[in-house]
């Protein structure tokens, strides 16, 4: 990142921080800060021009650099300060979490894909089994995370990684653990069969070309 870009990036971070401060100050001013759940998280992946070290990949990748994001939850009435959780989750879990936190439930006719994280918010040491699935047409990518293990397919090649020892996804364990690979592949395929198919014409653009630009 060049000096000019670094300066712009610092200004963007400062502006974001200031905006979050305004929101939190407004909650305090209205006397509802203690009983309000505030979640700060991110869009998936680093941009293609960024450095996501120590992770590999960025947007349009199902490697960890393309899908792993941070989140911070603030809710003084229910969350103790300073807690850190190892629980795996997805953004869709926040819908279920917010509903449970508010004493509501999803319409049975429209079940949620997410799982409530409320027990984790109240006790960061609490964890539960939470397999995570991904798929995308770009490069025929698919992924499944179960515990520390991750199954990944890119361009027709299957990989198996132990992220507890290899978060950069450099050591493919598939040749050494064929049974685990097969089980995770079958698991992913069963999940995929339960989902609507991805339209054949669902494509992505890795950058702006003339046809993507507004009319001039």
Model region roles, listed by residue range:
Residues 94, 146-147, 155-157, 163-216:
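Long, internal low-complexity/basic segments
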Residues 1-5:
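Conserved small/polar residues in nucleotide/adenosyl-binding loops
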Residues 34-36, 81-144:
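Polar, surface-exposed loop/tail segments
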Residues 10-13, 17-24, 28, 95-99, ...:
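Non-transmembrane alpha-helical segments in soluble domains
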Residues 7, 14-18, 89-96, 112-115, ...:
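A structural signal for well-ordered alpha-helical segments within the folded catalytic domains
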Residues 25-78, 90, 216:
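Histidine-centered active-site microenvironments of extracellular/periplasmic hydrolases
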Residues 9, 13, 20, 37-42, ...:
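Beta-strand elements within well-structured catalytic alpha/beta cores of enzymes
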Residues 33, 50, 64-68, 89, ...:
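Short, solvent-exposed loop/turn segments at the edges of secondary structure
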């Amino acid at each position: 990142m060049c000096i000019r870009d670094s300066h712009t990036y610092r200004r963007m971070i400062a502006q974001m921080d200031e905006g979050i401060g305004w929101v939190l100050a407004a909650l305090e001013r209205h006397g509802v800060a203690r009983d309000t759940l505030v979640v700060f998280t991110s869009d998936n992946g680093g941009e293609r021009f960024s450095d996501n070290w120590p992770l590999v990949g960025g947007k349009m990748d199902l490697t960890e650099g393309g899908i792993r994001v941070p989140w911070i939850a603030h809710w003084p009435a229910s969350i103790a300060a300073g807690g850190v959780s190892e629980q795996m989750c997805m953004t869709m879990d926040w819908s279920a979490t917010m509903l449970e936190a508010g004493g509501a439930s999803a319409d049975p006719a429209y079940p949620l894909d997410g799982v409530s994280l409320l027990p984790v918010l109240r006790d960061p040491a609490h964890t539960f089994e939470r397999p995570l699935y991904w798929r995308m047409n770009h490069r025929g990518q698919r992924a499944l995370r179960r515990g520390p293990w991750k199954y990944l397919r890119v361009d027709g090649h299957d990989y198996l990684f132990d992220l507890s020892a290899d978060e950069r996804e450099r050591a493919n364990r598939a040749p050494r653990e064929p049974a685990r690979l097969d089980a995770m592949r079958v698991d992913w395929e069963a999940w995929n069969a339960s989902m609507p198919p991805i339209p054949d014409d669902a494509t992505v653009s890795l950058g702006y070309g003339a046809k993507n630009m507004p009319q001039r």
